[in-house]
């Protein structure tokens, strides 16, 4: 087992940072009245890392203004016991089998994703159902990693980003 960090904010956010990287096997948890975890840029979960964010109030439990990248075996848990989203994420990237459990508040969704162009799978659940603002991609939740297909069908017009496509 790796290191763990638990932060609670009594009148703000549990964690407020930029470029968060949670190393392999490590665990980070944030809880606060203005949100559990807030990143003004990217969040990276390395293999086997876990991130949890909680709030009882009227802000997102997790807010990521950049890309949230999850490596194989990593886990994300978000819970908003107030009104808003469990997580608001600009862009999502998943590699391998990951675990996501997301619960949104009374007037929102478990996961709100601004840009999602590829289809992805995760073990877990999202209540209410994940919402994508821009793009045709979606996240499908399954109850066991064995149900994740080896080749995930992509939406019409999807172009996988590679080093070659990024240079164009």
Predicted feature residues:
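A composition-driven surface/loop motif
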Residues: 1-168
